[in-house]
Amino acid sequence: MEAHVKESTDTYCVIEMKIPYSGTFLNTEENIQHCLNEAGQLATSCALSQFDTDGSPIKVAKQRYTSKGLTGKYYQTPYGDFYLQRHVYQSSNGGATYCPLDHDAHIVVSSTPKFAKMVSSKYSRNASSDVQKDLSENHQRYVSRSYIQNVSQAVGEIIDSRPSWKYAIPISPTLVYFIAISLDGTCMLLCNDGGYRQAMVGSISLYASDGERLYTRYTAMPPEHGKNRFYETFIRDIKSVKKLYSQAKYIGVADGAADNWTFLKEYTQVQILDYFHACEYLTSVSNASFKNPIEGKAWLEEACHTLKHKENGAAELLNEMRTFLKKRIRDGKKETIQTAITYFENQMDRMNYESFCEKNMPIGSGVIEAACKVIIKQRMCLSGMKWTDTGAKTVLALRCLNESDTMWEQFWDKVTNIN
């Protein structure tokens, strides 16, 4: 070992190390990292030992526990693993043992908080094999894939067991004019012949009066029969935001699925159909109604402009589409036009885009569409991925915290302050 403890007290330690130069500069850099890792192991061991007791009896939940003596354990850190002797306790009635050091230092499985934070963050973004390779190549740390999964699972269980934790949003209420709530689903593959089923994701986005998006937080849940778990979690998040921003106008933005509006009506004052979904129907009408593609493209551009910028534009387009049914076109194309007509009829109250734009309200569901890709597809649908409910729930919880501004750091601040 090229590093050793020169001095250690209750408040600091001094590590001395010798770094050899070796061949190419790349090899020297590898030596530097190796020595720094050795120093990190020694420093972490010294710091961690400060959380141990002197072996005297203690009370846990008003029950007396006595030490069973020093017991050794390997601890995993960002710098490597080391073996440490610490006191383990048990009550006179037997049962589960208790380690004050593990509890007070907030050890996760056998990982220090920093390493658990590092591993679970990486695992939220990449498969365990990629995390393993990253740790080995970039940190000179080898851990098994199962350990990466177990630590991440333990972090996910902490998230799941603390639903009452409140997360601050770093945006002053005076800056927030609109809050858009959206939800959508996308498919992922389940284990045990579960096939492809729909996972749900929700977003809560804060907007300034000029329409600039200031902040977004996400909620997601793996496929389930019904959407009870997702709704329960999303409603809790919505209510926590409403307590912070009671003065804002709440807007529901979504595609045309009926169950979206059933949910959003209860929690928003204004409901807006995604403008771009409406334009997709206009595209279908254009293709079905015009033999000349140049004429069809010209009509589509004008129709999209009318829909967005003209008062009662949706109603005007609805009437125009009805006239297209009188054209001499194939029944299949008439069916396409009729589908668009029915869609516009059902969504008319949510298509006042001219008014919405004048007030700088968000009219597109791009945030939630992106969330389907970023929160779910980007990780859950990596090559060869199949998921159990527990594994999917863990990764989605980690991803939501990681992708929601400041929440990941807040979560770990709370973890390290659990009594």
PLM feature spans:
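Catalytic center-proximal scaffold of phosphoryl-transfer enzymes
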Residues: 1-45, 88-419
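An N-terminal low-complexity regulatory-tail signal and nearby short nucleic-acid-interaction modules
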Residues: 49, 53-108
